[in-house]
């Protein structure tokens, strides 16, 4: 029986007609294989119609995966108590036998496929399977990557309708030409709260060769929303093979003088200020998480892979996050997950207002002081609780930039690290290679706040991409360095660090100071201000920052603060070079240029140290 004949026999006539309209034998083969394997009771094919999207929304409520909240458009979804985050241990990249890739959890492909197919046999029995079509990047553009998602979770399908552009018509347009990504998900057997029961059989297997991701016995978005971090592994591999960049970066517009618009991307590890930077209220957001960057006629053009936000809700409060707060308290289409609900209203940790003493949360019925089976007190919401919302709900979204098929020109790229004592608040690279290597490839995040006499642990996280790499880091960096050669106009590269501390542990910067660094970077992209050359890159002049602090924040900025923040800390910089160099030497197969650029930086620092000492005032470089 041909795949088409099987589908005709297995699907309702109305659903079969939807598939027939696409005319793609590879798609038919894929659907036939996995509908037979998962063995659902019924199959629903989603087109781009509003009716089909509404059907998914309705099913999420009817199947008990979501419940309506008091405000129109708001729903709550709960994942299982032990299904609240990405499962790093059971997320594996399937590779040919004997292949190992540094930093990556790999598994023999044949063995992995055999295991996941056994786990998924009949896993959707008695359930409804949804087949959804989406695209990554703007439609009908150089960025477009079509993708098909099979899932028996209406919550997962609903999330994807909020986060991604619909792709059924794009599949029809491309027909047999479509080079598409594939995602197969089942939540598995559900308990009485409609959460995945067999967590011991939770698996997330990424088959690079087949460009397919399998996800079983889990509901948490990071493990199940195929087009997010699962697709990201596949697009990183594609980008490296095809010579473009698939990055873990926000994309935002910084508004310069006289209505000038300049677009920046930014890669920051978790807890380093990525979302708060992208959401500054007087600038404009294009995307908060994933960006494709391609060469178009010698320009680096960027596009948001997504059209929505799957954001961490903990700590979102009215004072620090006015825009997100407003969005979450308006009648938008929002899925809240793993927060506390009382009388139809959502509450979360550190929201800055009183939280009820009881209600329902990810642990079931909750009361203050409730403990789990290990004796840990359960907080009102999970620390990884989320909100899922479309970007068009945000008043400061640059909607034109979000959907333009040719993307936006990237003027600057920002790498945001976190340390108490090394990187100054903002600096600019000398050139592309210097930025890629000493800023992007050397990105670290201090995991604990440094206290007196005790240093935080610095997690190495180049380009904030380590968790998602699907190729050798050397290959990934080589592609980055090669990409520059295609460009006539090169984005400037910057590094930021919002977390410097004084010796007594006090922060050296206020939360909103970052908005000044952004304005300075925007001016530098256009050559509107000069900068001071130091051994580690260009830093701002005091006079320029003094003026910008007044203009942007209406704050006085003292010479003393400037000096404390922008002092070049030579011993700390040298120690960092040592750390980064060792990591890459141990890994092997790294472009030689990386070691050359690090050595040049070391040489400049030692020279400056001999002249000015260990801690060099920025005024010394004038």
Curated annotation (Swiss-Prot):
Pathway: Carbohydrate biosynthesis; gluconeogenesis. The lineage of its organism: Archaea, Methanobacteriati, Methanobacteriota, Thermococci, Thermococcales. NCBIfam families: PRK04210.1. One of its GO terms (biological process) is gluconeogenesis. It holds the Pfam family PEPCK_N. Mn(2+) binds at residues 229, 248, 289. It comes from Thermococcus sibiricus (strain DSM 12597 / MM 739). This is Phosphoenolpyruvate carboxykinase [GTP]. Residues 360-374 have a biased composition (Basic and acidic residues). Binds 1 Mn(2+) ion per subunit. Its cofactor is Mn(2+).
């Amino acid at each position: 029986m041909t795949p088409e004949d099987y589908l005709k026999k297995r699907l309702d006539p109305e659903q079969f007609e939807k598939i027939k309209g696409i005319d793609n034998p590879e798609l038919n083969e894929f659907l036939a294989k996995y509908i037979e394997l998962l063995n659902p009771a019924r199959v629903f094919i989603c087109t781009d119609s509003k009716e089909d999207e509404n059907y998914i929304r309705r099913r999420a409520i009817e199947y008990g995966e979501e419940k309506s909240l008091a405000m129109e458009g708001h729903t709550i979804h709960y994942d299982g108590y032990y299904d609240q985050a990405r499962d790093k241990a059971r997320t594996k990249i399937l590779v040919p036998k004997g292949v190992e890739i540094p930093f990556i959890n790999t598994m023999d492909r044949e063995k992995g496929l055999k295991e996941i197919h056994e786990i998924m046999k009949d896993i959707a029995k008695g359930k409804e399977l949804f087949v959804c079509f989406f695209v990554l990047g703007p439609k009908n553009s150089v960025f477009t990557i079509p993708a098909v998602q099979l899932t028996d979770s209406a919550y997962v399908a609903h999330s994807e309708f909020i986060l991604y552009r619909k792709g059924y018509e794009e599949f029809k347009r491309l027909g047999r030409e479509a080079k598409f990504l594939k995602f197969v998900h089942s939540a598995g057997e559900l308990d009485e709260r409609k959460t995945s029961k067999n967590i011991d059989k939770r698996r997330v297997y990424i088959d690079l060769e087949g460009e397919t991701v399998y996800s079983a016995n889990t509901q948490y978005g990071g493990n199940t929303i195929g087009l997010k971090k699962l697709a990201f592994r596949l697009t990183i591999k594609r980008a490296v093979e095809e010579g473009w960049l698939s990055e873990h970066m926000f994309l935002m517009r910084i508004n310069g003088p006289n209505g000038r618009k300049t677009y920046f991307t930014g890669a920051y590890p978790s807890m380093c200020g990525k979302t708060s930077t992208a959401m500054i209220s007087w600038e404009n957001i294009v995307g908060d998480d994933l960006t494709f960057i391609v060469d178009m006629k010698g320009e680096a053009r960027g596009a948001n892979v997504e059209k929505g936000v799957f954001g961490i809700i903990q700590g979102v409060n009215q004072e620090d996050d006015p825009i997100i707060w407003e969005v979450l308290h308006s009648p938008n289409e929002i899925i809240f997950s793993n927060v506390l609900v009382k009388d139809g209203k959502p509450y979360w940790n550190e929201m800055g207002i009183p939280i009820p003493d009881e209600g329902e949360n990810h642990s079931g019925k909750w009361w203050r002081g409730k403990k789990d089976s290990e004796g840990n007190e359960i907080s009102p919401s999970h620390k990884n609780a989320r909100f899922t919302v479309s970007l068009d709900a945000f008043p400061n979204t640059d909607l034109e930039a979000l959907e333009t098929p040719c993307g936006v020109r990237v003027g600057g790229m920002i790498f945001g690290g976190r340390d108490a004592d090394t990187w100054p608040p903002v600096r600019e690279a000398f050139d592309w290679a210097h930025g890629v290597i000493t800023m992007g490839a050397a990105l670290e995040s201090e995991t604990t706040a440094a206290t007196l006499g005790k240093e935080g642990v610095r997690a190495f996280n180049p380009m904030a991409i380590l968790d998602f790499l699907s190729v050798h880091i050397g290959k990934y960096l080589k592609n980055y360095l090669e990409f520059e050669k295609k460009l006539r106009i090169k984005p400037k590269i910057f590094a930021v660090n919002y977390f410097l501390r004084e010796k007594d542990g006090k922060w050296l910067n206020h939360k909103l100071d970052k908005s000044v660094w952004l304005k300075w970077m925007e001016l530098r992209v256009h050559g509107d201000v000069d900068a001071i050359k130091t051994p580690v890159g260009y830093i701002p002049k005091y006079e320029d920052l003094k003026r910008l602090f007044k203009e942007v924040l209406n704050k006085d900025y003292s010479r003393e603060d400037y000096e404390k923040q922008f002092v070049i800390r030579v011993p700390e910089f040298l120690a960092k070079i040592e750390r980064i160099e060792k990591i890459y030497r141990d890994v092997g197969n790294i472009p030689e240029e990386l070691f050359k650029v690090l050595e040049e930086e070391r040489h400049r620092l030692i020279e400056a140290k001999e002249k000015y000492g260990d801690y060099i005032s920025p005024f010394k470089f004038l």
